[in-house]
Amino acid sequence: MSTAARRRLMRDFKRMQTDPPAGVSASPIPDNVMTWNAVIIGPADTPFEDGTFRLVMQFEEQYPNKPPQVKFISQMFHPNVYANGELCLDILQNRWSPTYDVAAVLTSIQSLLNDPNTGSPANVEASNLYKDNRREYIKRVRETVERSWED
């Protein structure tokens, strides 16, 4: 069954294959273009550097008019990531635009890693450490990076 959402996701997949953004990858799971596995590599020169963070993206038939649900599978310590892996990111909520594609979503998440929004924390402990004790925050992030290699 071909729907607008499925056609759009196939275009997104083709773009990810032919023009992948640096440090991110994603593809649909076998036999279901509506669920994708993704990986974000921690950006260089940040506490997340060298991390390999796995995510799952779930799309509904309303895509691209409705954003995907995106969740980290890898354990994360970040002000905008809930304990269950869900993200607090404006473009996945009230600032979504149908012009965003999978690549744009993943690069936005990659950018968020080193530029958290502490005004809207999902993880209050991480947010407080980021603001008040950067050394301890970096230590905790580096522990997360090391765990990401084992995932």
From Swiss-Prot:
<feature type="active site" description="Glycyl thioester intermediate">
    <location>
        <position position="88"/>
    </location>
</feature>
<keyword id="KW-0808">Transferase</keyword>
<comment type="function">
    <text>Catalyzes the covalent attachment of ubiquitin to other proteins. Plays a role in transcription regulation by catalyzing the monoubiquitination of histone H2B to form H2BK123ub1. H2BK123ub1 gives a specific tag for epigenetic transcriptional activation and is also a prerequisite for H3K4me and H3K79me formation. Also involved in postreplication repair of UV-damaged DNA, in N-end rule-dependent protein degradation and in sporulation.</text>
</comment>
<feature type="domain" description="UBC core">
    <location>
        <begin position="4"/>
        <end position="150"/>
    </location>
</feature>
<keyword id="KW-0805">Transcription regulation</keyword>
<keyword id="KW-0833">Ubl conjugation pathway</keyword>
<dbReference type="Pfam" id="PF00179">
    <property type="entry name" value="UQ_con"/>
</dbReference>
<dbReference type="GO" id="GO:0005524">
    <property type="term" value="F:ATP binding"/>
</dbReference>
<comment type="pathway">
    <text>Protein modification; protein ubiquitination.</text>
</comment>
<protein>
    <recommendedName>
        <fullName>Ubiquitin-conjugating enzyme E2 2</fullName>
        <ecNumber>2.3.2.23</ecNumber>
    </recommendedName>
</protein>
<keyword id="KW-0547">Nucleotide-binding</keyword>
<keyword id="KW-0234">DNA repair</keyword>
<dbReference type="GO" id="GO:0005634">
    <property type="term" value="C:nucleus"/>
</dbReference>
<dbReference type="GO" id="GO:0006325">
    <property type="term" value="P:chromatin organization"/>
</dbReference>
<dbReference type="GO" id="GO:0061631">
    <property type="term" value="F:ubiquitin conjugating enzyme activity"/>
</dbReference>
<keyword id="KW-0067">ATP-binding</keyword>
<comment type="similarity">
    <text>Belongs to the ubiquitin-conjugating enzyme family.</text>
</comment>
<dbReference type="GO" id="GO:0006281">
    <property type="term" value="P:DNA repair"/>
</dbReference>
<keyword id="KW-0227">DNA damage</keyword>
<keyword id="KW-0749">Sporulation</keyword>
<keyword id="KW-0804">Transcription</keyword>
<keyword id="KW-0539">Nucleus</keyword>
<keyword id="KW-0963">Cytoplasm</keyword>
<dbReference type="InterPro" id="IPR000608">
    <property type="entry name" value="UBQ-conjugat_E2_core"/>
</dbReference>
<keyword id="KW-0156">Chromatin regulator</keyword>
<dbReference type="InterPro" id="IPR016135">
    <property type="entry name" value="UBQ-conjugating_enzyme/RWD"/>
</dbReference>
<dbReference type="InterPro" id="IPR050113">
    <property type="entry name" value="Ub_conjugating_enzyme"/>
</dbReference>
<dbReference type="GO" id="GO:0016567">
    <property type="term" value="P:protein ubiquitination"/>
</dbReference>
<dbReference type="GO" id="GO:0005737">
    <property type="term" value="C:cytoplasm"/>
</dbReference>
<dbReference type="InterPro" id="IPR023313">
    <property type="entry name" value="UBQ-conjugating_AS"/>
</dbReference>
<dbReference type="GO" id="GO:0030435">
    <property type="term" value="P:sporulation resulting in formation of a cellular spore"/>
</dbReference>
